[in-house]
Amino acid sequence: MGEDSDDSAEADSHRLRDLIENSSDLIGAVAGGAIGLVGGPAGSIGGAAAGVAITKTIRRVGVEVYDRLLVARQQERVGTVLAVALDDAQARAADGEKIRDDGFFDSGEGQRSDAEELLEGVLLQAANAYQERKLRHLGAILPSLAVRPDIPPADGHWLARLADRLTWRQFVVLAIFANPPEERLSLRDIDQDVSGGMGPTGGLRQEVEELGTFGLLGVTNSNGETGPVGSTYDSASGIWGVPMVRWRLTLQGRLLVDVARLADISTTDRESVLNDLLA
């Protein structure tokens, strides 16, 4: 990534602070008390707290994308994701997590860095994210990848694209099965066997099936190993043919949960969707 001039960096820092403050209402609604940047120390945006490489990326790409947008609500969504990204980056730095040094933030001749490309993609997705509860999790993607050299940039783009495609309710389902309530799932399976029930119908059923199709939600076999839907006899016709107590996140599903911080989804949101699943 090329060097910013001092004047340019300072101007972008002021613009970034302004656009985040202009998004403060949505930030409060989406992230609540989790975001402490607005009105906070100038160092958060200047790079002293979050790390210079990631802050430069957020500052440069954030201002550029924000200024391209003409619709105020889209600008607020982008400002919200930028605030989340800065806050997460600052928290990770405070926890002693090290920024990757494998070239993720380096630009080449006439080429932007992988970090810049990924952030632009996430921000453009965020601008059109009408399910605004997703914004907190879209904002987590760059700071997560910034400290995960084990995740290649191409995989990072794939994860960001997946996060864009999924609905909020699919986010919640993944969060539930990151730590599944096995006793409740077992009781549900027994009730379904007795009553001959088929589980929920409509959109939720289709959304869960789609998580299996995307390779994010799988099933355990007789050895307790998790595999994709279709890898066991009873999952040949789809995930709903398998007792729910055997549903598990795949490796890809766990990766998305980690990168997008889906484990932070509230207990209230999880309970609401879980009750629908168990119906």
Named regions from a protein language model:
Residues 7-83:
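Membrane-inserting effector segments that mediate pore formation, membrane fusion
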Residues 120-279:
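Long, helix-rich, hydrophobic modules that act as membrane-proximal anchors or helical bundle/coiled-coil regulators
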Residues 57-145:
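Eukaryotic partner-binding/assembly regions in large regulatory complexes
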Residues 5-8, 115-117, 147-151:
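Short amphipathic alpha-helical segments, especially helix-boundary/capping motifs
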